[in-house]
Design a protein with these regions (language model features):
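N-terminal amphipathic/basic-hydrophobic helices that include classical n-h-c signal peptides
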Residues: 1-19
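Short loop/beta submotifs within extracellular cysteine-rich repeat domains
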Residues: 49-50, 160-162
Length: 203
């Protein structure tokens, strides 16, 4: 996700964030039938369903990149490959703020070779099924991973707060860990890389 906007209103723990090319989002853990309830409410309030995608995400890192708090990610979605750099920005609020630069690339193999020459190796792989909704000024996504179900809202902090109120989801558990950090906790190590993949049916 990207293009988060950085204005915030005061009150309820919400203030003002710096203006920069950042991704601003909030993640929630989903249990039981909450996803169906929220999707029903999104439809009722006129949200636009933008479809579902399957992703394979590979995280690359190095000692120096970890020290800077950054990661590089290659994401494959169908025939599309995206190269992304992210770095977490600390704040005193309950949303995640990250500097993000992303571009589409044509040759994933060449990008991997370039990253290797720069000293960046793959450390994590996780698969994800993502359904996306456009709701007012924010993007609402439902993510299924091998280790759980989550929802994210991305936009301005004002927009996120408004969506929480309209969808009546303030009771949901907020998740501060990123998907890479959750993969590190719940994934399995294979050939030196921690992986979290869906189980495949059949032989």
């Amino acid at each position: 996700m990207g293009n988060g906007r950085a204005s915030r209103k005061s009150g309820n723990g919400y203030g003002k964030l710096r203006s920069m090319p950042t991704e601003i989002e909030k993640k929630y853990r989903l249990t039981g039938g909450r996803r169906m309830e929220i999707e029903s409410e999104l439809r009722r309030q006129g949200a636009e369903y933008a479809g579902e995608e399957f992703e394979e995400n590979t995280i690359f890192s190095s000692d120096s990149l970890r020290a800077a708090g950054g990661i590089v990610r290659i994401r494959r979605v169908g025939e599309t490959t995206l190269l992304t750099y992210k770095r977490r920005v600390e704040n005193q609020f309950d949303v995640k703020e990250q500097i993000e630069h992303e571009t589409e690339v044509r040759d994933a193999g060449s990008i991997r070779s370039i990253l290797a020459e720069l000293g960046l190796g793959p450390i994590l792989v996780y698969e994800k099924r993502r359904s996306t909704w456009k709701f007012r000024s924010v993007e609402v996504v439902f993510d299924e991973l091998a280790f759980g179900s989550f929802m994210e809202i991305e936009g301005s902090v004002t927009g996120i707060r408004e969506a929480e109120l309209l969808l009546e989801i303030e009771d949901l558990e907020t998740v501060h860990e990123t998907y890479p950090s959750l993969t590190a906790q719940f994934g399995s190590r294979s050939n030196g890389i921690i992986e979290s993949r869906f189980q495949k049916n059949g032989p």
